[in-house]
Amino acid sequence: MGIQGLLQFLKEASEPVHVKKYKGKTVAVDTYCWLHKGAFACAEKLAKGEPTDQYVQFCMKLVHMLLSFGVKPILVFDGCTLPSKKDVEKARREKRQTNLQKGKQLLREGKLAEARECFSRSVNITSSMAHEVIKAARSEGVDYIVAPYEADSQLAYLNKNDFAEAIITEDSDLLAFGCKKVLLKMDKFGNGLEIDQARFGMCRSLGDVFTEEKFRYMCILSGCDYLPSIHGIGLAKACKLLKVANNPDITKVIQKIGQYLKTNITVPEGYIEGFLRANNTFLYQLVFDPVERKLIPLNPYGNDVNPEELNYAGPNMGDSVALQIALGNMDINTRKQIDDYNPDIPQLSHHRSQSWDNKQLNRKTAHTDSIWYTKSEPCKTTKIEEIHSPRGLILPSKKHTVKRSYEDGVSDTDLISQYSFSKNKKARPDGDDPMQQVPASTMILQPLDDCANTKPKKPIHQPKTRNAFATFLQRQKQDCSSVSATGTRSRFFYKPADEKPHCTEKEQIVCNGSALDIAKETHELTEESSIKTEKEDSLSTISEVCKPNNQRISPLQNQRSCFTWSGSLDSESSPTPKQSPMLLSLQKFHRTTPYMQNEAENKPSWQSSCIKSDTVSQIDSNEKLLKKQDIEDTDSDEHASTPESPCQFTMKASPAHQSFFPEPKGSAPKSKVPGLLKSQSVVSGLRTKVKPRAPAKVSGLTNRSNTKATRNNENVPGLQATIGDLWKNFSYKK
């Protein structure tokens, strides 16, 4: 069936597509191809004569698939046998009868597999089987038409006259009839191979010189249902012949076919007449116009064509008979009345429900947009989705369709309100400080207005922010924006006027590598006004707060600090602010160390704390080393302190490692602060001995101590090497 090798020959013009490409449009279907596929599943029952409707279910399943994608199908069935195909139909009938007899014989012998194969080849689609599919399509409001003769010519007419956008078939003869778009090899999912006539120029074998007429000649020469081919002539040689021959008369080209192809090919007698009959059959085969409801040729007759001589293309049976055949009311073989369907009478169709929102659409009558309706337009390719809406397709209509609401679901209004800003939201005043909204528990160090004033302010209850820690870091970044990113600053060019009183706040500490922010409330303690009064106090405070006008705290000091003060040593100090419940729950994990005092030397001993520690022995060894270094640094810093600045201490090391502040040498023994251990990362970084800082230089660098007494000094002549000494050291002995 069809033209052998044509699909492979037009491979470059084909394109794999899905049927949803034609959503909202109308397609015509060669239903006999579907009937043959559906009959294969029940071939054994059909051969035995058992009743079955599997082929009907198969065809309607494909119809429902097209409707689900918004495609309106028109089912086209074959009619009477065409006189031009009597020989072909006779040969096919004999072949089917032979396979049927062979299958019955194999079934008697018990060879079931071979018998089924023979039965599948012997399937004959009868008019009664087609009528069962017609009744099923009619009940669901699907358009159909029975061709007066062949379905191929009727499909081509529907496509050329814009009744259908494309043709769904398995027969390649549709291309020879001049169809614009043909969808071949479509499966049950809607995938197929589309061949568009507009893409024929992409085929290298055809070239740009081929026209629709030459393409039809090529198909006839290569062999079709109306005329067998000449021995040795296929699509390739037929295409080559039409490219080489310049004579417009095709009969003369066929006579000289051997000269054009340079082969010894003889044209059989009667071949030219058969060629002309086949060409006229492709052009003037009778079809039925559903709008005018009469028989017409596929293409208008030419001036040199006599319709009475074209009986081989289908004799004129009359418009009334053709109408009854087209409606499926008359048997095509016996011409007996088998049904009384009238498309002009509105009938209630039982559509298959595709979704929840198209039940009302299914109640529409079938004749409203049918091709049989006399007031309908020929083109039915627009707005077809209003009749058969696919699953989930939102159709434009005045009525608002309401979907089923899910239980415990969020409505669309609530969902939109979650992603939109409220219009009644009050704007924050310009004077509001984002730091005021940060709870007191997030403040590591609280700034003090005066060193002597140690009374903490009452925490102000502020509404909880979305991310207080992010606000805190943003405020700290703005306050410390003038500080160098590396934390280094020349002490020579330093001016007290550049100091800002803030930047004393620290970030929260994340210990043990977790995301838990442990915020501990601390007190800023100050020292007494002079060194003499400090010696008389029984307790002194440990602070890292200095006067803002005299000394600037390095930003690296705030960033590298891994501990905070957790209590007060002064009995006269104000009470500790109320801790948060989170801190109270974590207080049981607070680690404390025994007091360490050195009464013999009355020197302060320092003790650090860290929540994350590997071993206790490593921390104790580092504490002893730091204790010894701090005592030595205290002795060197005692001479540098003056009565004018009693609270100011000289920084012992670089700002990156500054975490301890010494007290004057003559101070009374201090009580130890429990639970203050330095983190291991900081302690491990101070393994080398911290040297006391020398007086400030212009370059801002510390002066290294002169370890060698014999070092050359250019300012002292006695220590310089003279030329005579050099000659003595490097002279050779005689």
Curated annotation (Swiss-Prot):
Cystines in this chain: none
Enzyme class: hydrolase
Pfam families associated with the record: XPG_I, XPG_N
Annotated region described as Disordered, given as residue ranges: 599-650, 656-675, 685-716
GO biological process: one example: mismatch repair
Binding site for Mg(2+) 1: D30, D78, E150, D152
Residues the record lists as binding Mg(2+) 2: D171, D173, D225
Keywords: DNA damage, DNA excision, DNA repair, DNA-binding, Endonuclease, Excision nuclease, Exonuclease, Hydrolase, Magnesium, Metal-binding, Nuclease, Nucleus
Predominant subcellular localization, coarse grouping: nucleus
InterPro entries, alphabetized: 5-3_exonuclease_C_sf, EXO1_H3TH, HhH2, PIN-like_dom_sf, PIN-like_EXO1, XPG-I_dom, XPG/Rad2, XPG_CS
Subcellular location(s) per record: Nucleus
Bias (Basic and acidic residues): 621-641
Bias kind Polar residues: ranges: 604-620, 700-715
GO terms of molecular function: 5'-3' DNA exonuclease activity; 5'-flap endonuclease activity; DNA binding; flap endonuclease activity; metal ion binding; single-stranded DNA 5'-3' DNA exonuclease activity
Residue ranges of the region described as N-domain: 1-99
Region (I-domain) location: 138-229
EC annotation from Swiss-Prot or TrEMBL: 3.1.-.-
Free-text comment on the cofactor: Binds 2 magnesium ions per subunit. They probably participate in the reaction catalyzed by the enzyme. May bind an additional third magnesium ion after substrate binding.
Swiss-Prot/TrEMBL cofactor(s): Mg(2+)
A GO CC annotation given for this chain: nucleus
Function, in words: 5'->3' double-stranded DNA exonuclease which may also contain a cryptic 3'->5' double-stranded DNA exonuclease activity. Also exhibits endonuclease activity against 5'-overhanging flap structures similar to those generated by displacement synthesis when DNA polymerase encounters the 5'-end of a downstream Okazaki fragment. Required for DNA mismatch repair (MMR).
Family that this chain belongs to: Belongs to the XPG/RAD2 endonuclease family. EXO1 subfamily.
Official protein name in the record: Exonuclease 1
Organism for this UniProt entry: Xenopus laevis (African clawed frog)
Protein encoded by which gene: exo1
